[in-house]
Regions:
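Active-site neighborhoods of divalent-metal-dependent phosphate/nucleic-acid chemistry enzymes
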Residues: 72-112
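Metal-dependent nucleic-acid phosphoesterase active-site entry motif
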Residues: 1-19
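A secondary-structure boundary/capping signal
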Residues: 7-8, 38-39, 111, 127-128
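Acidic, PIN/NYN-like endoribonuclease modules and their adjacent C-terminal/linker elements
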Residues: 86, 100, 105, 112-141
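PIN/NYN-family metal-dependent endoribonuclease catalytic core
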Residues: 6, 22-51
Length: 141
């Protein structure tokens, strides 16, 4: 099963726009078609960002439900290698650390420009749209 790491912006976008590519990406995880890989640092970022005032309009029950699904069904890892200088935003290095430890196939982000490389130790860095297109191609084969 494909292993994916999901950037916080994808989670937020999925909750804001339930018919969007980020939402479709998360639905693949929820349906069991891929495995989301998480570290404590990433999950904490999810919680902190979703608790911000500007996201108070989100359906609180949906937020709790999604976080609960992550808690129960994700592949949890503790990164052994710390990365300091790959992503343009220092906080984004946590996603690379998780991907490296989990041997993830994809890191999915809406902020592709934060990652100056398209691949990091065999993890492909893609947008939700690119990921969905790749999944469609895999299903056709």
């Amino acid at each position: 099963m494909l292993r994916i790491v999901v950037d916080t912006n994808v989670v937020v976008s999925a909750l804001l726009k339930p018919q969007s590519n980020p939402a479709l990406t998360l639905s693949l995880f929820i349906q069991g078609d891929c495995t989301v890989c998480l570290s404590k640092e990433i999950f904490t970022e999810y919680e902190e960002v979703l608790a911000r005032d500007r996201f108070k309009g989100l359906d609180e029950a949906e937020v709790k439900k999604l976080l609960s699904i992550f808690t129960r069904r994700a592949l949890w890892v503790v990164p052994k290698v710390l990365i300091y200088d790959v992503a343009k935003e220092p906080a984004d290095n946590a996603f690379l650390e998780c991907a490296l430890e989990a041997k993830a196939d994809f890191l999915i982000t809406g902020n592709i420009h934060h990652f100056p490389v398209k691949e990091f130790h065999h993890t492909h860095i893609v947008t939700p749209s690119e990921f969905l297109n790749l999944m469609i191609q895999l299903m056709i084969k």
